[in-house]
Amino acid sequence: MLGHAVNYGSHRTRRSFSRIKEVLKLPNLTDVQTQSYKWFLNEGIREMFDDIMPISDFSGKLSLEFVDYKLLKPKYTLEEARDHDANYSAPLHVTLKLTNHETGEIKTQDVFFGEFPLMTDSGTFVINGAERVIVSQLVRSPGVYYHSDFDKNGRQIFGATVIPNRGAWLEYETDAKDLAYVRIDRTRKLPLTVLIRALGFGSDSEIADMFGESDSIRFTLEKDIHKNPADSRVAEALKDIYERLRPGEPKTTDSSRSLLYARFFDPRRYDLAPVGRYKINKKLSLKNRLLRQTLAETLADPDTGEIIAKKGDVVTHELLDKLSPYLDRDDFKMVTYEPSKEGVLPDPVTVQEIKVYSKVDPERVVKLMSNGHIADDVKHLTPADVLASINYFFDLQDNIGTTDDIDHLGNRRIRRVGELLQNQFRIGLARMERVVRERMSIQDISTVTPQQLINIRPVVASVKEFFGSSQLSQFMDQNNPLGELTHKRRMSALGPGGLSRDRAGYEVRDVHYTHYGRLCPIETPEGPNIGLINSLATYAIVNKYGFIETPYRRVSWDTHKVTDKIDYLTADVEDNYIIAGANARLNEDGSFKDKIVLARHKEDNLEVTPDKIDYMDVIPKQVVSVTSACIPFLENDDSNRALMGANHQRQAVPLINPHAPIVGTGMEYRAAHDSGDALVAKAPGVVEYVDANEIRIRRDDDTLDKYVLEKFRRSNATKNYNQTPAVKQGERVVADEVIADGPAMENGELALGQNPIIAFLTWNMYNYEDAVMISERMVKDDVYTSIHIEDYESEARDTKLGPEEITREIPNVGEDALKDLDEEGIVRIGAEVQDGDILVGKVTPKGVTELSAEERLLHAIFGEKAREVRDTSLRVPHGGGGIVQNVQVFTREAGDELPPGVNKMVRVYIVQKRKIQVGDKMSGRHGNKGTIALVCPEEDMPYLPDGRPVDICLNPMGVPSRMNIGQVLELHLGIAAKQLGIHVATPVFDGASEDDMWNMVREAGIGKDGKTVLYDGRTGEPFHNRVSVGIMYYLKLTHMVDDKIHARSIGPYSLVTQQPLGGKAQFGGQRFGEMEVWALEAYGAAYTLQEILTYKSDDVVGRVKAYEAIVKGERIPKPGVPESFRVLVKELQSLGLDIKVLDMDHKEIELRDMDDDSNDHFNIDTLSKLAEQQEKKKLAEEAAKKDDKPDEPVDESDSSTSSDDKVSK
């Protein structure tokens, strides 16, 4: 028998074809969310308060300090928050201490800091009743970056940027003449020496001594001349910088000094964050710069004087290891520079320096200067950082040091939910700090308390804004468990502080070699976001600095054998090693079988001997994301189709009776388990009781655990969220085992679709262009039937004319329309409703004009009843019919929180059972998508020799050009596994080979070619050629024809243009665009075109008259002026252009006169006739004044009434 048996949970065994043993368990797949939030609650909040506090007033008499914080019990449980459209959050209380330094009095008080949203166990937040996910952001890490380029003359120019987490950027650059410049905060450039002088090193000799005598320094010093002899060089430099940053303002040495200090050296204004300090120390440290350099001085032990390295030695890895402990010391090669007292900071600057030879001119000595040993908690820049970064910049011109690749994952980091939240909270606290300072100055010092100083509104507002409207706070994709899991593991380069879609180029979107084992190279959206939104690889974790690490097996340096010791490496650390692939063949003892092994180093693929290898991949699937790891035979698919296959799985609709794939990858169990949709046992025990609603498990220590199952809840994607028990009474369970399946699960495994019998066969052109033909059995047996739940809300509000009322007494509605409503006017649960049926009867008071005497009398006798009301009932929208599943009524009396002005709210859930039908979209796992073109009767389907009809026919033309051969291999392996009655697992890059597949086919006793004779169901004749028939996992996707089909007869119009609205959501019409107009013009269908552009569109008066004429059975009158013509005229008039409509004789026609003619004789085409009439009318009026008898018949149309008035009448 091929393969080996592997258990997934206690209910499913698969035959696995993997050859590589699993040395590392998959980490929890939602850890990227939950661990980060845990950090925020435990450390992040405290860190933030410590940054902002203590807050002192301007005189220093009062100070407010942070003591502690605590989160209390949530107001609502998770379920209540969902039902009440509320937040799942807990009150945050902070203990603050107010000290009066004059009297020594201390007041400590507990202050409420607002409700703080809590994360659910599965890594989501419930905000306003809906589950949301905070997507992690991929951003450029703070630090110092160097780059080089070539100008148009082919000269190499260099640049450097110091990027903080918060604060001003510092940029260095050279030009074609080798002059070095600096830009501070994106302003105009200055000679770089100006910045050095401003730090307190004013003379040319000091600068030359510090940075050496390179051409670049010499030229820059020559350009940077002393312009104002009244000022010292340091003062002049400070003023030059001030002028660049604040042009036009009066400059003094003091103001210039404080401005430069505030920009870079003030911890409150400038923040590198721990990661920025780590990156800068790493980049500038001599440990990382000495390798392969030739020493220009002899290095000795400072204590013993023993020589460690001689002048002229080249620093190898071994020598560097020997030097490392000395480089970490505070007394080895340290140099202290004394700045002038006029400089920004008067303190001495200590750096570590070692002399080496230039790579460009081997005779010249160059200094390597590091920033000394700056502590990790110094979050602002120091003068030592600036000097060392300038030294690195000049060293690059001597070919010492390396430039940085911005797309390298060592230079991009992840901001996870905890950090994003902390940043947002910090903004709120900073706003609050300003308010506290102001209140400290105003309030009476003796009586003030912390509570009176604090205003929590800015803090609450910033948190609310982040969860409600940030680009990274997204409505969770709840189509199926896989979509949910992927959403939590998503990495977005967009969002505040990230990239924007339009500005992102190809480089940042492209797959980088550092993505290996960190970000999936396959799963990314198609369209404008391609490459900007990625998915975390299966085994990747995020370290404390936010860099992605991936695990590798360590190879022993002595024995060159692969050990089971696992190291997690970041991308920049990995660059130092040579790494073998996971499929390198090993002996039992862990040594490499082959003399030459395929390995990677940076972006190169090498063939090396085993003694050169440092690490080995853990497992092949560490390269891809969870979704891609669910595609069997991924290695046989073209990458573009694999991308579609990964995305389609997330769009699969949970079915009524799902089945896990016969051909899986072994990833299905973990994906379902970690998604948060399955119910998992907390502890081992025995199942004591099971029904559809709850499971009770008796633990080994005799305590009883009760698990309540979710039943028929509406998910975010309007799908049915339902849990079903996966265990039986008396069954033994272990901790962390799946005991109840969520949606799209079977036996604890992900089950997104079904395993139908599929034939690659064209059938009467019904498979043309990727169309799919399915058997009627799929409909009859509910194979692809899914349940969808939609909710509709109706609110009874207070209006100006009185309150709305939810009632059964609706005007002008027959009794048959009310048959399913209860006495309150709310539909009963279980009622079957069609489009347009009333769900909630509601009446709204009409505007009442002055009442007549009779009405007043009736009013006095019968009270409110005689008031006129209009029907504003909630009705089933088009395509929304189904069965009423649940009704929720919220009222103030019952203690429910309702928005202001709302007295009662009713929510009705309608459930639909959707069978598969023509127009629905289906897909496999290999990007082989198509829509259903025909549901064929079972008896007409092609059938196998044993009489079984196939379920689905796919077009064989869809395979060769698309190069997704994985589907063909899956097809053959699937039918073999089905015949043998087993499930198989073929993990990605380590699964069944083609030979394995054919051996399995042979074992199952299927023909040598894997094909079969197929018979035509209508004639009984065999098809000419043998056909590939097998079992392939096939999904029904969320793009269903029921959601897309749309038709309009009459409906709403746009207010301004009076044209029908567009789109299904607005119940709009289809736009008759210019191309459609050309088509009718080409046919000469003038009248058809005229009515489309007038009555059926935006001729307001014309459509009312046409309606009247149809009702009365009269001739339809001629159309009037389309409203959009008026809009055009008004638009042009609003621009100050005097637009008039003229007739043939250049006489003006008034627009409103073109609208109406009581006898309907006038025609819009004969504008000149109208002008004649107007002329005659004037003459007639003049004649009437002279003598009482008119000469001409006067047209008595009401030209004074505008069309709007008529419509309202």
From Swiss-Prot:
Quaternary context: The RNAP catalytic core consists of 2 alpha, 1 beta, 1 beta' and 1 omega subunit. When a sigma factor is associated with the core the holoenzyme is formed, which can initiate transcription.
Region (Disordered): 1173-1209
Function of the molecule: DNA-dependent RNA polymerase catalyzes the transcription of DNA into RNA using the four ribonucleoside triphosphates as substrates.
Superkingdom to which the source organism belongs: Bacteria
Family under the similarity heading: Belongs to the RNA polymerase beta chain family.
Keyword Kinase found: no
Reaction(s) the record says it catalyses: RNA(n) + a ribonucleoside 5'-triphosphate = RNA(n+1) + diphosphate
Entry's EC annotation: 2.7.7.6
Composition bias type Basic and acidic residues, residue spans: 1173-1192
Any Pfam family the entry gives: RNA_pol_Rpb2_45
GO molecular function: DNA binding; DNA-directed RNA polymerase activity; ribonucleoside binding
Name of the featured protein: DNA-directed RNA polymerase subunit beta
Species this protein is from: Lactobacillus johnsonii (strain CNCM I-12250 / La1 / NCC 533)
UniProt keyword Transcription present: yes
GO cellular component, one term: DNA-directed RNA polymerase complex
Lineage, highest ranks first: Bacteria, Bacillati, Bacillota, Bacilli, Lactobacillales
GO biological process: one example: DNA-templated transcription
Keywords: DNA-directed RNA polymerase, Nucleotidyltransferase, Transcription, Transferase
